[in-house]
Amino acid sequence: MSQTALILLQRVEHLGQMGDLVHVKPGYARNFLLPQAKAMRATAANKKRFETERAQLEAQNLKKREEAERLAERMHELSVVIIRQAGDSGSLYGSVSTRDIAAAATEAGLTISRQQVVLAHPIKQLGLTEARIVLHPEVSIPLTVNVARSAEEAERQARGEAIGVQDEDENILGELQAENAAEEAAAEAAEASEEA
């Protein structure tokens, strides 16, 4: 399989640091790294150009990183609430996407794009979930996503209280146990009346 040689212009997660010579699949280079100016082809002319511009690129990167760190300090322990419909078991009708999280974060005062939101797994249940907001390739902040059916439920979840799904299950279990006890009492009464 052919590989394309590139020089990274910034840190790329799981690939390398600025200035690294990397070999990637042509599609990854053509569709992601080159259009987003994260890398340039590793030709002799580009290598010379990169070495002459390296100090300028590093200074730009340092400035952007410092801005991202200042923003990260201001947005420490950020949390967003997303209201969704869900079934009795707590399963969402659909899922919460990175686009939904980016929109909620923008409403909370942090303007980000959906590409900056990183989820470990899709959100398909009610509850609190951790996401990560990548402000810079070297700076990210945690984000708590509170998915609930209503604002009141979101407040209860934020305080650490159990939501209604478990309460309903306990009520149903209690009702079933009461019905079973009543049936057993009726059966015992019927047996006692037959014996007499």
Curated annotation (Swiss-Prot):
It comes from the Bacteria. It holds the Pfam family Ribosomal_L9_N. Coiled coil: none annotated. One of its GO terms (cellular component) is ribonucleoprotein complex. GO terms for biological process: translation. The keyword Signal does not apply. Keywords: Ribonucleoprotein, Ribosomal protein, RNA-binding, rRNA-binding. One of its GO terms (molecular function) is rRNA binding. Belongs to the bacterial ribosomal protein bL9 family. Binds to the 23S rRNA. This is Large ribosomal subunit protein bL9.
